[in-house]
Amino acid sequence: LGLEPWGKAAPESTQERALHALHPSRLRWTLLLLAVLLVSGIGATGFTHLMTLYMSEGMDAMRTAAAFSLCGLALMAGKCVCGALCDKLGSYRANYLLFGSFILGCTLCVLAPLKSEALMLASAVFLGFGGSLITVGVSIWAGDLSTPERYEKTLRLFQGAYGLGGIVLSFLPGAIADLAGGYA
């Protein structure tokens, strides 16, 4: 698990040395917080529009609700697996894997006009599983992008940006649907 015995000084890792030497500019921190804000816009509100998308395409409401429930189950499973993946593969590779799953789910949502139940279920699973990183990844990113001394401050900044993004960007899917004439 990466735990160290109490009282034994562990040698500083390469990552910690690099982070101690690195003093990101305000521009880099601003861009990083903007990225967290945008990610939260997807993670905090994006899932709620999955049902609306498929129902607006004429899919059965009960089957769409089942797909949404499946998305929730995949999200819970992904949250349980996310930490283990980060420990086993490293957070860098786990980010690629989980975001790849999320992007695949989004890509399958684009195929909603085909009215395929299999594609709807697959999109729900990939969105849910990949979306786990969007919801629990903030603390992982804060740990990777800060030193132990700065972790709490970095996490607080990231969580603030995440919360702000969820509030500020929550209207976007509906506004885009209004402008585009529908969700699909």
Identify the role of each PLM range.
Residues F68, G72, F99, L155-G163:
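Small-residue-rich transmembrane alpha-helices and their cytosolic helix-loop interfaces
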Residues L1-T14:
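C-terminal membrane-cytosol helix-exit motif in multi-pass small-molecule transporters
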Residues R63, S69-L75, K79, C86-W141:
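C-terminal transmembrane helical hairpin of 12-TM major facilitator-type secondary transporters
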Residues S25-A84, L169:
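Extracytoplasmic gate region of multi-pass secondary transporters
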Residues H49-G58, W141-L145, A175-I176:
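Membrane-interface helix caps of multi-pass secondary transporters
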Residues Y54-M55, L85-C86, P173-G181:
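Interfacial helix-cap and linker-helix signal at transmembrane-aqueous boundaries
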Residues A61-M62, P148-F158:
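Loop-to-transmembrane helix entry/capping segments in MFS-fold secondary transporters
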Residues A142-E152, G181:
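Paired intracellular helix-loop junctions of major facilitator superfamily
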